[in-house]
């Protein structure tokens, strides 16, 4: 499918870790927010993870963020502004990890807390 063809081009796949997978692409020309290029639940999430892994696209486990992105953002759309900070943390880590793999200097620390507003979490705050 066209969606699966987009996965190898993604910068990161954010997972839940098994039920949801959301592939994001950020064009670093600074003209917009990261976009959801693929997303899936259960079997489709597994396929997205497998295609990502086969193409060296980093997988990043962040359950509340994965659920929020999966539930709120359509494929091909930019992420909403109030999820930008959380996604930026993940992308910054992914880019630092790539640099680490190339240079073997200063392994980055994965972010562990994400500011996901209550209305995206799908639970009662």
PLM region spans:
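Helical hairpin unit composed of two closely spaced alpha helices linked by a short loop
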Residues: 1-66, 71
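Short secondary-structure junctions and interdomain/linker hinges
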Residues: 1-4, 14, 76, 94-101
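Generic alpha-helical propensity signal that fires on short helical segments
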Residues: 31, 38, 42-44, 75-77, ...
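Short basic, glycine-rich beta-strand/loop surfaces that mediate nucleic-acid
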Residues: 64-95
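Short, charged, intrinsically disordered terminal tails
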Residues: 79, 83, 95-125
């Amino acid at each position: 499918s066209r969606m699966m063809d987009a996965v190898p081009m993604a910068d990161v796949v954010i997972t839940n870790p098994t039920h949801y997978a959301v592939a994001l692409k950020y064009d670093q020309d600074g003209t917009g927010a990261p976009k959801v290029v693929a997303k899936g639940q259960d079997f489709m999430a597994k396929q997205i993870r497998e295609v990502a892994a086969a193409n060296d696209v980093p997988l990043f486990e962040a359950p509340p963020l994965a659920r929020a992105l999966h539930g709120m953002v359509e494929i091909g759309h930019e992420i909403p502004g109030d999820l930008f900070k959380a996604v930026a943390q993940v992308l910054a880590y992914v880019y630092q990890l790539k640099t680490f793999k190339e240079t073997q200097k200063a392994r980055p620390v994965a972010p562990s807390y994400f500011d996901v507003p209550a209305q995206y979490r799908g639970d009662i705050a």
